[in-house]
């Protein structure tokens, strides 16, 4: 029987229930294409990109830099250089800079032609380049390409000491901004010249940490924390490593990963780091975002302070896609669907292929009974990641809701295959619901038993325990479903969202369920 660690040691990109609070890096097989060949959101879904085919004149995407030495020890610089240059360019309000994570995913797709890449990214310019690092020297070659013509507007190569990587990025960002927007205004020049740290070694450690954090696995997050801690020791005034350690600690508690510390100790460490970051720089959007995440774990019954923190994060940086996603999902958990949809759509406008956000929009619509809209958002999520177990499960539920046997059967066929342990409860919940709908109680019970066997006693992993209870409820095992729900922890706002799902309708009038539903209800106006 799997232990707590085996269930909680998953890569979140594979284990979602479509109700994730957190966004994840998009690894795995991504198609990024709707059934009609267009990029997501799929055409039938409510559109959020009014200018999808008319890119802003000053729109630009920075592609990951190619490591020409093929030395994997420096792979972290591929995304690190691109993200840092994009972050600098975003300080120029006249530029429309695409999200680095969106650009990374699109650049990894099958699109090769520059013009097609520009259409997918919805930009007029791309920045592309390569680097070689060896010893104490680094060579960076870069060019700015205008689209759709493919004309090179500017190019250069820099050979500098490795310790001057920040200077190289500053020079590139300044040249790109000037070539696109024209002469820079004094505030723009100052913004581009601002450096997060003056310690090159600390900066390098943060880039390494970012590389590991994006992988979203327990081992990689542990490595990221080590890199960030080392950076903070080198430069005690450096805000970025503190904010990211705090965010990483939030991930650890959310996913129930075993790092050898009680959850309360991990939270205390994260809160201390983010408080220190905000004392150094109260205008750090990432620090406010990390604070919001930590408070959902520290205050699971009230979410006290979460909405103000996340609202502050998006106000400070309206291009912070992750903060918009977190704000929208928090509002979803609080039952504020209109405000939630608005924030989630802002995230999708910034990153159209963000399948976790697309899935959350589908969940919101499903809970409100807007099944046609839920279907479109869910199809958009599957267009990006056809193997996403949560969206496949949602496709089954939505097909059942509209009595579409053919679609439900096809979706169950995609679910009913060998899966990692961390996907089994989610898949079994959908399969048990389908079997019960068809009247095959024996098969539904077998699915539920499979979910129970895999889940074991990991009662702190709510996002896998709740689907296990769903499977039991669908199979008619109502007392066992209630027993499991009462054992799951914490009894807070996160649990309440699961309890709102139609899968628990067989328990809706059960006195124990009624008490649990009331106990986990969010406050009317969280502070």
Predicted regions and their residues:
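N-terminal secretory signal peptides that target proteins for export/translocation
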Residues: 1-12
